């Protein structure tokens, strides 16, 4: 791997570009150099870079069965970790590659100039969405789980300003956030003749959208139904206490 040029590595696996970026290497500035030479130029550990690239093949996503065994609170923590990955790693890399490719190849791909504007708007809305989930929705679900185990009237009152119905309505409104991007880029279609930078960018956008869909399914098919059951259980408990009083 260290003896291959960055061009060869990116042709081999487009996802390597983002990993190299996280390691401090802007791959498109060194396409003709070998990975080993670039690491020496940048004074970066060849072992760490090679390790990061090899770990890409065995990503750290949880299996469906493992997610099923998680409690709602554990699932919230897992989703918050993926939110962090999106905001701190995936979005910055994609945004950088959009800007870089648009500057260098906008004559061949004029749609990239519009993409830069659309993606900036998408990023703003998306970051607000995951912040809302982290701070409001997941906090609420964790309280639901806690109060189901140890119920009190005081704790129940703390949940009265929000409900899962509020989140479901907002979540459905935010579905398919990347529709305009996908439409602009013709479903991320590429050809053999396309520039490597463009092919890498399309791969990153397509992979990101695929990851978002999987993330959304975890929320909609696993987390939300469980949270609704907790909410219904607590509501029933509260109504029983009211009747007794």
Report each predicted region and the residues it spans.
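Small-residue-biased structural context
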Residues: 1-245
């Amino acid at each position: 791997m260290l003896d291959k040029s960055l061009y060869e590595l990116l042709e081999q696996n487009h996802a390597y570009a983002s990993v190299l970026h996280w390691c401090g290497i802007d791959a498109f500035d060194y396409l003709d150099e070998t990975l080993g030479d670039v690491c020496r130029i940048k004074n970066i550990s060849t072992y760490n870079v090679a390790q990061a690239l090899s770990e890409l093949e065995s990503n750290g996503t949880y299996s469906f069965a493992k997610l099923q065994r998680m409690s709602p609170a554990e699932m919230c923590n897992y989703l918050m970790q993926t939110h962090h990955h999106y905001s701190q790693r995936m979005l910055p890399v994609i945004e950088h590659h959009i800007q870089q490719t648009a500057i260098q190849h906008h004559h061949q791909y004029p749609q990239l100039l519009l993409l830069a504007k659309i993606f900036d708007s998408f990023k703003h809305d998306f970051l607000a969405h995951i912040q809302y989930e982290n701070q409001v929705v997941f906090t609420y679900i964790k309280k639901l789980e806690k109060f189901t185990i140890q119920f009190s009237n005081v704790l129940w009152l703390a949940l009265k300003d929000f409900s899962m119905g509020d989140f479901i309505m907002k979540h459905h409104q935010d579905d398919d956030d990347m529709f305009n991007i996908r439409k602009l880029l013709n479903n991320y279609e590429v050809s053999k003749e396309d520039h490597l930078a463009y092919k890498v960018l399309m791969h990153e956008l397509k992979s990101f959208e695929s990851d978002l869909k999987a993330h959304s399914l975890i929320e909609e098919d696993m987390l939300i139904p469980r949270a609704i059951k907790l909410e219904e259980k607590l509501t029933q408990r509260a109504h029983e206490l009211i009747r007794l009083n």
